[in-house]
A protein has these predicted regions:
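Alpha-helical transmembrane segments of multi-pass membrane transport proteins
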Residues: 1-378
Length: 378
């Protein structure tokens, strides 16, 4: 995402005279939107990791006799994480769009001066106008279906892929050379993800063999009764790790170690997942070691000073910090669009009712054969 934005929007902004520091900030900010805005690949992988961590956390809570083991907590799935992250992601997107519009209106250290030369916009062709109208509509429709739970995120992604192939063939823009390049990139990314998964799982097993998970669980047990403090510790670890690890490495390596003890103390795992996504996004943007920030600076020529980039990033980071504080203090922000509760309803079945229910669920006995009718003489 970052490299694509640098070579497309970044070059257009440079042609318009936007300073390098602001181009760097905008590319870094826009490239991290795929972390929190559903249905991103990072969010899907985190949902799967949180499902395993939540299962292990409830098992740990049962072994330690914690209160969360008897709270009737329901194991989360990817759909829960998608719905929990939707409201915070939408709020952050609106705030960042507002900041970008406000900075563009000020034109202070931003777009080129009035006297700067700029080329007139090239009019769109009929095919480009059709593409501009159809593709965003399709994306919004698929996102709406995923958000409402009518289709799974993987199904929506597969549908989009098939429709994109059909559109490429119908518009005669998809050639064999482009198709081969797309398939090659897709296989390279898939292979890299599987290699990263194998390496991360192996490393996690090595750490567990040395008792790292038991040590972390013992530390988190010392914070029993203070779930917010425990969450702050875990989120701080994730924030620091985001300086040197990318999102996939964090999900495959760090989440399986630190999340089960935390989810043994906290009931709402989807709320924790939404906060995790926001903190990862902050770690990628914080100067001077933010992962997205470092990569974005490397794509801009001339390379801007870190101080200028930090000043350009400050409004976006303030908005992100505000959203994190809001979600942490008001967990209901992750529950507005969720279709299923975090806990299961309490049900008590008496002995007689249980016996009756088991009889209803058992196979009915075969009816006795009817007696043969007696033959009548002709």
């Amino acid at each position: 995402s970052l490299v694509t934005l640098s070579h497309t929007a970044g070059q257009a902004w440079a042609h318009e005279g936007m300073p390098p520091a602001r181009r760097t900030a905008l590319v870094a900010v826009a490239s991290t939107l795929g972390i929190i805005v559903p249905p991103s690949l990072v969010l899907l992988l985190l949902g799967d990791a949180m499902l395993r961590a939540h299962t292990e956390g409830l098992t740990l809570a049962t072994q330690l006799g914690l209160a969360s083991a008897h709270a009737g907590t329901r194991i989360i799935n990817t759909q829960d994480v998608l719905q929990a992250a939707l409201a915070p992601g939408a709020l952050l997107l609106v705030l960042w769009m507002g900041v970008t519009w406000w900075l563009a209106q000020r034109r202070t250290g931003g777009i080129a001066d009035q006297g700067a030369a700029s080329s007139a916009p090239v009019p769109l062709t009929r095919g480009e106008r059709w593409t501009l109208g159809v593709v965003p509509t399709l994306i919004v429709a698929l996102l709406a279906l995923v958000t409402t739970g009518r289709v799974r995120a993987v199904e929506a992604a597969a549908t989009a892929g098939v429709l994109l192939l059909v559109w490429g063939v119908a518009s005669r823009q998809l050639t064999l050379r482009r198709l081969a390049q797309v398939l090659d990139d897709a296989m390279a990314l898939t292979g890299a993800l599987f290699a990263l998964l194998v390496a991360a799982v192996t490393f996690s097993l090595v750490l567990r063999a040395y008792g790292t998970d038991a040590l972390v669980a013992e530390w988190m047990r010392a914070l029993q009764g203070q779930p917010l403090l425990a969450m702050g510790v875990v989120l701080s670890v994730l924030l620091g790790s985001a300086f040197v690890l990318d999102a996939f490495e964090l999900i495959f390596l760090i989440i399986p170690i630190v999340m089960p003890p935390l989810l043994a103390l906290v009931d709402d795992a989807a709320w924790v997942a939404a906060l995790t996504l926001l903190v990862l996004q902050a770690g990628f943007l914080l100067p001077p070691l933010g992962y997205a920030l470092v990569l974005s600076r490397a794509q801009v020529a001339p390379r801007p000073a870190m101080g200028a980039v930090a000043r350009a990033l400050a409004p976006y980071l303030l908005c992100l910090a505000g959203v994190i504080a809001l979600v942490m203090t008001v967990p209901a922000t992750t529950q507005w669009l969720r279709s299923t509760p975090a806990t299961l309803p309490e049900m008590s079945i008496q002995g007689d009712d249980l016996d009756a229910l088991m009889r209803e669920m058992s196979h009915p006995e075969a009816p006795a054969p009817a007696p043969a009718a007696s033959a009548t003489p002709p």
